[in-house]
């Protein structure tokens, strides 16, 4: 399997509950039966992890057209975003998110097909690329992500990236420290963080590399690009589809970390024999 069953089973359990019910409106009931949601879900996970084309993943059980149609249907109903939020809430309840320390950084990946979130990449000889502005907590758990063209600077993406904290409502610590690299070293960034009431640690331009607490976001970016081929080379052209795959990838990452951290703290019937 593309993802171990100990991780994908609890994700599917929550995902299945979010899928809206579909009524059979055919008057005679003699049409082709609807492909099971579980089959489509597993195929989409394969697309995400392996990065293969839909036509390569499709087989006699599910066509590529069904994959795309069901994917768009679930996106319209907000299933992927809701799944990501459920995973975050579960991790926060059982382990606890380190929201007192936040880290933001950008990551540029190839986008050979272009699209709504593609631009000329400054690190790939002007070829099409996509930038992900990622927000993580102090332990590297992905909290939110904003996508834009690769030619977009990191600083303008900081405000919409920090807006992802709104998903927690008022359950935020009184004091938050944001760690940023030298790409955010500007007066506008400091004014923005001062207006939000956040402390900040920003690396200085022209000084030697200062990793500090920022290494966790680099690790999470590596989890995205090395663990999910679809995110390493972005072949989707619509922003909402990219966001859906990022949300699914984040759900897998958070669930894996949750099981890993809970493995030494809790006991449950389906607890894996080895710590993931």
Where are these regions (language model features)?
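Short alpha-helical elements
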Residues: 1-276
């Amino acid at each position: 399997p593309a993802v171990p069953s100990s991780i994908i089973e609890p994700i599917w359990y929550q995902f299945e509950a979010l899928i809206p019910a579909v009524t059979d409106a055919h008057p005679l009931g003699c049409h082709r039966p609807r492909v099971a949601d579980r089959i489509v879900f597993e195929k989409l996970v394969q697309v995400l992890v392996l990065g293969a084309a839909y036509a390569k993943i499709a087989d006699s059980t599910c066509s590529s057209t069904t994959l795309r149609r069901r994917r768009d249907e679930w996106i319209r109903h907000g299933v992927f975003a809701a799944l990501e939020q459920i995973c975050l809430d579960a991790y926060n309840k059982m382990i606890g998110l380190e929201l007192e320390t936040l880290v933001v950084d950008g990551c540029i990946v190839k986008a050979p097909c272009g699209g709504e979130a593609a631009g000329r990449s400054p690190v790939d000889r002007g070829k099409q690329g996509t930038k992900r502005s990622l927000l993580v907590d102090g332990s590297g758990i992905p909290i939110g992500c904003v996508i834009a063209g690769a030619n977009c600077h990191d600083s303008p993406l900081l405000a919409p990236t920090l807006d992802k904290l709104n998903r927690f409502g008022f359950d935020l610590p009184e004091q938050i420290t944001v760690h940023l690299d030298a790409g955010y070293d500007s007066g506008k960034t400091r004014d923005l963080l001062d207006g939000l009431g956040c402390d900040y640690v920003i690396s200085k331009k022209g000084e030697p590399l200062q990793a500090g607490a920022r290494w966790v976001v680099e690790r999470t970016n590596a989890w995205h690009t090395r663990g999910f081929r679809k995110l390493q080379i972005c072949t989707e052209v619509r922003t909402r589809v990219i966001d859906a795959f990022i949300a699914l990838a984040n759900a897998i990452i958070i669930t894996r970390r949750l099981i890993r951290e809970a493995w030494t703290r809790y006991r449950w019937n389906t607890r894996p024999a080895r710590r993931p």
